[in-house]
Structure formats: C-alpha cells, structure tokens
Amino acid sequence: MAASRPVVLDVQSIHDFIQYVLDNHAVPSTLVVCSTKATFLEALQGEPQSSQDEQHAINPRRLWQTPTLRLLSTSRTLKLAFCPDITHLRAYLATYTITVAKRSVEQDDALRLPSAQPIMAILNPIELHRPTSAFSAQGLNRTFSVATEAAHHTGSKLVMADIAKPHAISNLGEELQTAEARAPTSPWEEELPILNVTTKRLGELSVGRTVKIKSVAERWCFFEKMPSLDSI
C-alpha cells in the first residue's frame, strides 16, 4: 500500500499523540522518541493531569500503568525507539528500511480502523535539534528529508509532532530570556536561522536570516489539527 502524505500534527499532549498513533497504526509501525527513555517518562510525568489522574497522582513507577502507556508498552505491532541525539536519529532513519524488512513476519490479528496503516511517528524532532548547531533550517531540512524518504520506502505514513515546552530555549543564553517570554506557543511557529553556523558577536547571538520552522517542514509535510480522540 502506498504511503499517505506526511503530516505534522498540531497536538498539545504527548499522551494524545501516543493514543492517536495506537488508534491508527497497522503493522509494521514505529514510534520514534527523540530523547532518552528517562527524559520521555519525565516529560509524561510533567504533563497536566486529568481529573482522574489528579485523584491518583502519577509517579515514575506507575506511569506505565495508565491505559495509553500500558497499551504502548505491551503492543506487539508498534515498536518504540529512543534516539537521544541527532546522530542516532538520522542513523536510525537511514536504516529504517532494513529494520522494517526484518519485521515482515509480524502478524496483526487486532481489530483496526479501516484507515489504519503502517505509521512512522516521530515525537519532538525540534527539541532534539534545539541545543545543537543543527537547530537551523538546514539542519531540520536534512532530518525531515531522511524521515520522509524512510517512510516512503517502507510504505509508511510519516507523522510528526513536537510538544511545546515553556523552558525550551532557557539554555541558549541570558540574552534570549526576554524573548523566551514572547515565544510562540507552537514550536513550529518559532523562527530559526537558515544555516547551521551561529556566532557570538558584540555580546549578541548572531544568526543571520531566519525562517519559521513550519516553513521548513511544509516542504515535506502537511499540517493538520489533531482530531478528537472521540471521533477516531
């Protein structure tokens, strides 16, 4: 089956993104998390809790007991991959065709939505690039290109999402702290330099021309609102 068009989902919750992937995937599918497992669990723990969760506070040991994460951890049809840096991410994507080929014997007897299909989901690619010199249109474009190619060659639908973090740019220097308060809610609306090179000049961060991350991603993906989980 031909892969559907790559998309970026406008989603505010990691839990919602995971549930979307679980509800819409078919064999073989993969959720690529752009962080370590520990950071991933920490982010899940730090998300606003629902009224039910507030009555039963989530702690690291109980995270995988929540319905969504229990399904993820026990799923035999959706693989989970952690890529803690750009090098690991690009290497994983470059060899994804081989990885999927080794999973050709997987069976899927579960009831699926008629629209279910193989999915390659990538969570927080922007955050992975942020603290590096590749946090630029050039760097992200290269990663998006490799991801799109991997999805195409495996007949998978590429689905990306980046969950906004209030402290996202706090490590870029004191001179950016004021700008942080004015930063857009969506990471995709953020401006970034076109090239990988950044230099300090006269006490300011010189990045040259900038472009929105969304404009970079639109070369490869369509942007879609996260559908209501009740309608899936």
Which residues are covered by each model-predicted region?
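N-terminal regions of ATP-driven nucleic-acid and macromolecular assemblies
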Residues: 1-232
